[in-house]
Structure formats: C-alpha cells, structure tokens
Amino acid sequence: MAKINELLRESTTTNSNSIGRPNLVALTRATTKLIYSDIVATQRTNQPVAAFYGIKYLNPDNEFTFKTGATYAGEAGYVDREQITELTEESKLTLNKGDLFKYNNIVYKVLEDTPFADIEESDLELALQIAIVLLKVRLFSDAASTSKFESSDSEIADARFQINKWQTAVKSRKLKTGITVELAQDLEANGFDAPNFLEDLLATEMADEINKDILQSLITVSKRYKVTGITDTGFIDLSYASAPEAGRSLYRMVCEMVSHIQKESTYTATFCVASARAAAILAASGWLKHKPEDDKYLSQNAYGFLANGLPLYCDTNSPLDYVIVGVVENIGEKEIVGSIFYAPYTEGLDLDDPEHVGAFKVVVDPESLQPSIGLLVRYALSANPYTVAKDEKEARVIDGGDMDKMAGRSDLSVLLGVKLPKIIIDE
C-alpha cells in the first residue's frame, strides 16, 4: 500500500515527479513481462522516433545472395557470364555436351548432346528441372583454377552490401483506474494486497492491449501462403475433414511454411502462432507435446512444442482461424531479425531496470477531486518498409508503422487461413 499512497501523496503535495520517481519505476516492471516478446523483435528507444537499420547482402546482379543459387566468385564469374548463352525455347535445341548456359542468372553445364530433345514438358523451368534430375545437365558452381586469379587483369566479383535505415514514430496507449485511496484502503481491510492488485490490473490490461496490437499487426504484415490446388486463396479447408486428417493436413502446411521462410530469408522459423481452434487441431494431431522437462525451455505464454521444434502460441482473441509461422532471431548484441519490431519508449531515462517501458501517472477527476492511477505506455511498432518499396527512393517515404502499406509484405512470417465448421452455441 505504501507505494500507491506515496504516489498519490506526491501528486497532491508537489509539482515535481522526482519524489515519486522510484515508485513510478517500481510499478512499471510488471507490464513488459506480459508482452509476447517471443514473437516480436524488441529494440528499446529513448527517442520520439524509433530508428531501425537493415543490412542487405547483394551479389553483382544486385540480388539478395540468399534468394538465388547463382555463384560469382568461381569459374563462371560475373564477366564470364556475358559470353554465356541464356536458355530460351530456341537456344535449348542447339545445346551440346560441354556447353554452358544460364537461366535466372544461374549457370548450368550440358552433360550430353541435345539434352532437351526427349523432354516433352512445355514449361521451360520445369523442363530444366527434369533435365537436372535425369543428369542431362548439371548446376555449374565450380571453383576456378588457381591460375584464373593470378593474372593482373583478372576480374574479381564484388561482395556488395547495403545498409538501410527506416523510422517509425512512437505512439501512446493510456489506461486509468477508478480506484481511489478509500477503495484501496477497503481492499486492504478485506485482505487484498492493494498495491499488487493495482499493478496487476493496469499492467495486465495494458499488456493485453499491446499483445493484441502485436498479434493483429503480425496477421496484417505476414505473407499469405498459397499453394496451387491446396490453398489457392490462402485458406486451407478443414471443414470436411476428420480429426486425424485435419491435424495431419494442418501440421504438414506448418512444416511447408517453415521451409518457405528458410528459402525466402535463410532464417529458420522460431515460432508458430495459431487461433484457439487451429491450435486445438494441432494439439489433437499428436504432433504437439508439452512435457514437464520442457518447461525450462518453453515460454510461459506458449501452448507447447510442435514435433518440428517450434513453440506454439495461442491467439485467443482472433476473429479468424489461422496459423502463422515466423522468425525472431537475436544475432549478437546489436542485430535482431523479426517480422515485427516492437520499440518501447523509455522516456530518455537512464534506468537500471531494463524492463521499464512507461510511467504510472496520477489523474484527478475534476468532479470528485479524487485522484486515480493511470498508466501511460509509449512504443513504436514497425515492419521493414524495404520489403514493400519498388525502389530505394520510394522506400524513404514509407512509414514502417503504416500497416496499410505493410499488409502482406513480410518475408519473415507466413499466414495460412483455416476454414473450420462453425460452432453452434445455444443461447
């Protein structure tokens, strides 16, 4: 009760916050513990505009190195490619053993004469895949002979990178209680711990607000996972399936989404979020486990571990049934990877407590003159705008917190809608 009383007393006896500051700090610790930090990249900020940086690793063709199978530092270098034939419907008929050709900047070597003569597939990309499987051609990623780079006029491929910066304005959320000093004293008289009661009330409700913002923003920015003939619209229809079939189908799609993220970003997925019913289907599938020995590794917010190692989080407030697979990776002290960035504003305070995210304030009702406790939290929530823009010039004017422009643009999280039979509830 002492902290609450001191905070209320400070509001009516002084114009300075310095006296009440230790109490403000102590009361704000609970909020961050309840935030879903496992599904969002967290970067604290003490500025009203949060700044984020992103590094792009590029090859000589200005492509992301992880999005192509092309190699440039070996026998088929960047300059050498200028003399290599591009694969087309016409050129594929003229290829012979030992020839090199390129397709989507990847170099291939022919292992036999007219390698495409017996392949009836009309789609050029699929025909190339068949030729690789049949050992008619191979991927040409060979390292160069030692003498290639010993001459003075040898061409060496550039290892390129680009550092981008984007900013998102810090925004606010504010809650207050109607609990007065008298009510707090009544709570104490009836056996309640009033300070803990107020802390839990405000911190829990504020964390619930922020978590909804995080989860709903994650739903917005995630790419939709569409597979021809299975999830053409971004939905998987499980409204007809038996429980084992539904669980097996949904778990299979989760595993495919993990592979998709790894292919598109090189990062391995670290979490899975599902609506309540979708999480129940995964649990019924038999591929969700929660053993007592897992507790030291599993977040207290998680439902359990899927068989592929991903912790499963349950979104109980979602208006739709869905499953999301995503990445949050802390790489060293400064580098964080994630689909959504959460930047709590620390008000410029140099605090020893790393969990401080906001401040409790005193609000006086002008009608009753009764002081009430309020919690003000400021933070920025952002996705990477460089996944949206057509070019760098356009990216500079995009706000990472503008979820209208960020919709469906993140390569670090993938969403699949789940169609389930409607629940009938008798009124």
Swiss-Prot record:
It comes from Escherichia phage AR1. Capsid protein that self-associates to form pentons, building the capsid in association with hexamers of the major capsid protein and one dodecamer of the portal protein. The capsid vertex protein self-associates to form 11 pentons, building the T=13 laevo capsid in association with 160 hexamers of the major capsid protein. Homopentamer. Interacts with the portal protein. Interacts with the major capsid protein that forms hexamers. Keywords: Capsid protein, Late protein, Virion. This is Capsid vertex protein. Proteolytic cleavage at the N-terminus by the prohead core protein protease gives rise to the mature capsid vertex protein. It holds the Pfam family Gp23. The gene is 24. The record marks 10-11 as: Cleavage. Belongs to the Tevenvirinae capsid vertex family. It comes from the Viruses. GO terms for cellular component: viral capsid. Signal peptide: none annotated. Disulfide bonds: none annotated.
